[in-house]
Amino acid sequence: MDGEMAIIESSNHVGTSSPTTETQFTIDSSALKDQETKESITNSPTSEVPIETKLPKSSDIVTEEKHPQNTTTDIENEVENPVTDDNGNLKLELPDNLDNADFSKLLEFDAKNDEALFNSNELLSHTMDPVNNIDLTHDHSREVSSKEDINIEPVNPDEDEREKTQDNTAAVKTEGIRNSEDTSIQKDEPTADAIYTDVHKLSVNKDTETLPTLVDEKNNMLHMRNNSITPIMFQQHELVGQPPQNTVTENNSTDAETTQRKLSEPIDASLPLPNEQPTIFAYARLDFQSFTFYVQTLHAIIGRRSENDFSHKVDVNLGPSKSISRRHAQIFYNFGTGRFELSIIGKNGAFVDDIFVEKGNTVPLRNKTKIQIGQIPFQFILPEQERNDDSKSPENADIAESEINTRNLKKNEPKSKKKITTGAKPKKAQTKPAVKKEKKPPKIPKKVYTLEEIPVEYRTKPTVSYSAMLTTCIRKYSTAKGMSLSEIYAGIRELFPYYKYCPDGWQSSVRHNLSLNKSFRKVSKEGKGWLWGLDEEYIAERERQKKKQSEIAVAKAQAAQLKLEQQQHKLQQVPQRGKKDIVSQRSNVNARKQNISQTLAANRAASNRKNTASDNQRTMKYLQEQLVILTRDRKGLSKQVIAAILTQALAMTINQVTQAAKNKGITGNPLTALMDKNPQHLNLILAAAVNAATAKVTKGEVKQLVNPETTAAAALAAKAQHSKPIRQPIVQTPHVPDRPPSQLSASASSHPNNYLHDKQPGSFDPSSLSRFFQPRQNARATSSVAATSVPAAASQNVDAQPKPKPAQDNDLESESGTSSSSSSSSESGSESDSGSDDGSASGSGDNSSTSSESESESDSGSEVDEKNNKNEKIDSESIKNNESKDDIPSKDENSSNDNREISKTDEEGHDSKRRKVSEDINEGITEVNVSLEEKL
């Protein structure tokens, strides 16, 4: 045997058969229940080999063979009366006269009785149970006979060649589930242990990547894992999908799929052994219907991989369905919670254990969690369950271990001739046949036609709209259930062959028209899409509208044609008419001009209305603000009383100004003009109206709510802040000696009939409104008279810079005034002029004001004349500029200013006029109050 040693472990392998002799060893099952049985048989075709067997005392070995009776009897005697050595081991002694030929015949099998010898009735199922329960640690106690105790004799070359042929034709059968019996040959336990240790060390040093080493590493990793995230190994028989291409699996279910090997050749370690499965390291796996994905990273993206866009990285491609987003979900390991989690990114969500999860939510993943994205379901598998399954079936580990040891022993002894097997027919493995993965055929791109391949009549796009195409297609090919999108596409290609050759893209326009055009409706649902049909009612209504519109268009066209014919007929009659046509043309031109003027007038009227409305709003706002300012001191009156007072005061003011302007024949908005030109006097009118309304509302309890003196002072101060002083020209006047104060007081007391002088300072003077609405008169040159009548006081202060008028002087002018009618008229002129844009009131205040109320009549008259002469030109210019807007005439000087002494008759005339104006104003105020009360 060339000094080699072979140990054959009986599993589910069928031994080689010899054509001449047949030997079978049947071991009683009762002998295997108490202790382990090991047999070691070393065969050599031409040499005598001593056989040592360690058997229990109760073991029975029955040998059946077709040989002479004397040989069988000798062997039976040896078995019945075993010979033991010094250590108590059984020893089989062979006679010296047993030659080589007789020994070889003893080991040959008979092919005729092969099936009878291995009858399944002789081995029961309970016989194999003790063997299956043998611990893995006992497998390492296999002992091998020593090399020195084996007698090796030369081998006959002829027989060696014959044995090689027999070995080459031997069929090795591998089974999925193994029931093995450990048999070994042992001569001496200490010697065998030492030999096993040497052999084991030799095999480890020879190949560190053998299958036993890998299996040991797997077992150690399973125990060391302890629920960590270390990738676990998946065995191929545990998977659902197709095995990888670099793995080789064997189906052990039938005898037809057995593999034949030459026993003389060494087994290549790179090739997988029968029943060996490839190992895949992964954290988890995703089981789909047609494939399996191994999660080998802590983060995996699930989605739809685009054919054209490679920017989106997808680890698990779920197909081209548009219901799946490019990045639909992600599986990641959460170190905080210590588990895998699923986060939904796609807008359509996903189902996790038949529960819908919306976009943006994250759910934990457990073992065997069912997930469905779109129409694709799959299962999440964790390796812990796989480890538990492995621990539940230790017999599988025993079988794998015994098989690996058998392979290693075969490698050491390739020329074994005899194999002793036990047991009945092993069960066939129930492994599923490997299902080849059917790859989806790649999407065939549409053929791009060249211009020569397209027929000439189909090279241009039809002028029909998509809605018309769809209507024609659906009416021609539609059924009662409707048409799907693919059917509509096919129908359009059939009706309009242009779309057979044109590139894709028109389908989106078709879908757009189907969804937005009301002529098409969804009839029924089929699968994921809808079947489309026509809305005949809507189409009929559209047809009626189109027909009506066409009729109207035809009527308009006929009317236009008739009008054109009439114009042509008139043109033909032009020579007959002659001059009449020329006159008519001129009249048409005049009419056109008139129309233009009317249009411009209308535009001006509209602009005037806008300006009037804006002026009214501005005036009312100003009046309201001033009323609020005037009534800050409410003197304990309630809000209701103050509101009534303000309402009546506002009505009185508007009514007084409007009535005065109406009596004078002035049009426009006099209140706005007064506010723009003289706001100080408007404030005085408001103050007087507030006092009158207070006395009326409170029924005399409160006679005066506003002090006119403080009102005038505040108004002048506000005007002085905003106005700029105007330099007046220097006027040379003759020197007039100053009058003593006694004369001034005498002249002031010489007019006891002065209306304004005798009136109380807190009362309202209705006649003050008439000063602003005097009729326009031609300005007269009074410069010479004014130059001769300037008092000495004015000549002394003429070179001084103009200053704002003091509040007390203004009050004296507005309330007390002068003692004559001429002084009152001149005073009204001075006050109206002081409200102009030039701020002349502030400039002339120094000349017109006096230090006491006893100023003489002549002095006051001369001062007023001087002021009127200075401001005459300015007033005339302002009147011209504002005449178109406000229609407010300027206040010209009174003719009586030329005379320093006024007769009593003129004074009485002025008094009568003032009385009449006051009566009219009072009547107007009453009417306004009544109308306001009705409105409120």
UniProtKB/Swiss-Prot annotation:
Q: Which UniProt keywords apply?
A: DNA-binding, Nucleus, Phosphoprotein, Transcription, Transcription regulation
Composition bias of kind Basic residues appears in: 416-430
Q: State the DNA-binding region(s).
A: 460-552
Basic and acidic residues bias located where?
139-150, 384-395, 864-911
Compositional bias per record (Polar residues), positions renumbered to this chain = 9-29, 243-257, 742-753, 765-777
Q: Low complexity bias: where? A: 779-795, 815-853
State where the protein is found.
Nucleus
| PANTHER family, per the entry | PRE-RRNA-PROCESSING PROTEIN FHL1
Q: What is this protein called?
A: Pre-rRNA-processing protein FHL1
Q: Which organism is it from?
A: Saccharomyces cerevisiae (strain ATCC 204508 / S288c) (Baker's yeast)
Gene name of the record = FHL1
